[in-house]
Amino acid sequence: MEGKREERKYNHGFFSSEVNTLAAIAETLFPPFSPTCQEENQTPKTQAVRSFMEASASELPIPDEVAEKMWKRASPKCLILVRIVLLLLSTRMGTLLICGRHCLDGKWPYINRFSTTPLAKREKVLQAWFKQRIFTPIRATFVYFKVDILYNIFARVDKNGENQLWEAIEYDIDKVENVPNERPLQKGIVETLHAKDTTHLLNSLTEKGLQATEDPRENALKIKCDAVVAGSGCGGGVAAATLASAGMKVIVLEKGEYYGPTDYSPFEGPSLENLYESGGNHPSVDGQIMILAGSTVGGGSAVNWSACIRTPEHVLREWAEECKIPVFRSKEYDSAMDMVWKRLGVTEDCNMESLQNQVLRKGCRSLGLQVETVPRNSSGDHYCGSCGYGCRRGDKKGTDRTWLVDAVNNGAIILTACKAERLMLEPNRTGTSTRKMKCLGVIAKSWNQNITRKLQIEAKVTISACGTLHTPLLMYSSRLNNPNIGRNLHLHPVTMTWGYLPDSVPDLKGKSSEGGIITSLHKVLGPDNKLQAIIETPSMGPGHFIASCPWVSGLDIKQRMLKFSRTATMLTIIRDRGSGRVHTDGRISYKLEKSDRENIRAGLRQSLRVLVAAGAVEVGTYQSDGQKMRCTGVSDEELDEFLGTVSADGGPLSGVKNWTVHSSAHQMGSCRMGINEKEGAVDENGESWEAQGLYVCDASVLPSAVGFNPMITIMATAYCISKGIAARTKKSISS
């Protein structure tokens, strides 16, 4: 997974004229400058900085790399818009339509194509389109170009594993010595991508002790077990371990691949491409929220930022009393949190904090605000800023190093690169259940094209732990129709602020990309002392950072990147009351409520105050107009005036002039628990209201948003559900 790029042909369907236009857009977004364009008080004009200022995003092979990624990852509708814009800009009349007077010339043929329009005029075109309020689909298309192009130029590495731009921005990859050469799940792993053909896979399954046979008539490999778990993340890992320890033969299906510490890459680009859903770029239908979700063995726990927070008391009270799910106020649930805490080795120890956490802590203390220490499932001396790419030190204890290890040690088998496609259902004639259907297992498919047969896993118990985005899709494909499936989606919307703190700021050492990711937290309280938001710090490689930054000009974006290593970013996270939906085709729609926007605004303003109090010389938001303020010599009145302009309105497809793109790393609620089938897709035991023997064991069962990092909540809930499954299964067998 190193991601080093050799010279090769690029696989996309764009015409050469479209790629030329894409190159012109890339050059406009990240153009070449002479070093004199740099501010006088910037970094000295070393060779690295000179090369950085002279670099252009149009340099080969960047346009083809971006084109290939778009062709592979863009949704069909998005790709249509991309091609329409590129094709129009490839012609003179199309350029006139989109660019107006900026493409006109005094010489024949009087109208330039976009690629031949002078750079300064191209920049004005993009600036105008980023503010366009009427033809928002075209504006959103230019935003898509901006995100993919800018991300690519900083996330890519050459055949030597280098990026020539990193030196100027003082970015170093996380160098890990003595990477543990271990794959703790190896004895229980069947990597279907490595199978030569169906027969080879069959032999691998039987060698692992599974009852597997080939059925040519049904074009299937039939596998029998006690329990099949689709998904290996926070919920699936716990469920697999719990059921396996109860003596059940468990099969885990994971659509991602398995990586040990030596398999992980230190590079941002290949890590996001291989470990995350849609390569780390999964937008809502309106482009307002970018979703990060793990897609590997261990799921989100393999790539999250280690924060371990118990379910808040007020949330448990709401779920038990208002949602009428008593387990959340039980000793059983408290014990489950204790069990999870212990198994993950959670500790509050932190021997050295990162720059961003130092900034959060210093700013809060300067303002007299409370700042809390965030426990982590890693050791106290774990100083790693790249756990979002998988922990190469093997220190962070995700399910791939804890619960799944327990499962494998108790005989569980994990099939990787294998996606659950639909459930095996039949009419329920048992007479012991009110559920109309009975689940008999799962039909799955390997990503390996050499495996031509489907996998038919027959099980007494079937658990969907595909995650909040994919569990509804498995239900839909199986023709389950509870109205709660896919709805009640909560995303913990994240909105960011930034502050630039030069090396001269006392007592704040390090770089923004180094150190423990989340070790501190501040709660933003409203006038009534109710929680409005929390403020934490993120992990942001240079690609993620520049893709998130507002683009107002080519020079501005380069100057921002030269400050990258000392730019501290603060996250405002809210417990969203608004909700969304996972549609049958996987699209995600989502809408914030008015109170959500008010809470986001409160969090943004508080985080800016914290950054100023910590010593930032310049602060700002990630709003599209590049909203920022220099802090040196600023009075309290001037600061308040600036904070009064801070808001978080719609996304690029909305009609607002200055828009914001939020992000989400926590997805919950799309198959929620409910006291009846009108209130939820599953009951308080996690069992589907429609199919006996079908359970859900992931974040999708949570009744509403948690408001804090939900890993502990998901695992504790999964533990309660799976303990109940094991007890009921044992009872039914004995009777």
Where are the regions a protein language model picked out?
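N-terminal Rossmann-like FAD-binding beta1-loop-alpha1 element of flavoenzymes
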Residues: E218-V252
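Glycine-rich loop(s) and the adjacent beta-strand/alpha-helix scaffold that form part
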Residues: T242-G269, M290, T296, N409, ...
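Near-N-terminal "mature-domain entry" segment
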Residues: M1-I111
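Rossmann-like flavin
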Residues: Y110, F114-V143, L150-I153, V297, ...
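Extreme N-terminal leader/targeting segments of oxidoreductases
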Residues: E2-S16, A48-K77, R113, I134-D226, ...
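N-terminal FAD cofactor-binding segment of flavoenzymes
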Residues: M248, K255-H314, N357-R365
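FAD cofactor-binding and catalytic pocket of flavoenzymes
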Residues: N482-V612, K628, V656, S664-G669, ...
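Conserved redox-cofactor binding core of oxidoreductases
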Residues: Y151-F154, E162-Q211, D215, P326-P427, ...
